[in-house]
Amino acid sequence: RPTTMVIKDSVRHYYPIKQGQQLDIMFTITNTGDAPLVISDIQPSCGCIILDKNSHIIIPEEGIRQFKATYNSIKNIGEVVHRIRIFGNMLPDGKAELTFDVNVVPDADYTRDYEELFQEFNAKNGIVKEMVDGKESELGYYVGTP
């Protein structure tokens, strides 16, 4: 049976954080209807958001439940906007959404680009030798006309 719900502060603007920091987001869902609220799924818009939740959640009539999401900013710089979608038996169309934005500030000393991060990752995992001593047909570039 459908019910109604409210997400407290469903649109949020967080203060800037430094790249690499994690942002813990607590959100509160209140079942304002007269039937149990059955949440069948909670989906973040990005793999950088980890949810602390069960797969199937029931909130009784007039009940309140808090959820925690953790945003990892390691791969972002600048203004980011993310959404957390909630699916269940809520009116009017079975879905609700929490939206948040935050400005991820790079380290003031130096900002590494993607190639440097990729090279650092490969060096830690022992892949550099394979990249340097690869086969001639696997160099990743060509000379002359294609």
Language model features with spans:
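Short, surface-exposed loop/turn segments at beta-strand-coil junctions that are enriched for proline
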Residues: N72-G78
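Surface-exposed binding patches on compact interaction domains or structured appendages
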Residues: D34-E61
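Long, low-complexity ectodomains and other extracytoplasmic segments of secretory-pathway proteins
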Residues: R1-Q21, T28, L91-P146
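A short beta-strand micro-motif common to beta-rich folds, especially ectodomain repeats
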Residues: E79-M90
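Asparagine-centered strand-capping/turn motif at beta-strand->loop junctions
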Residues: I29-G33
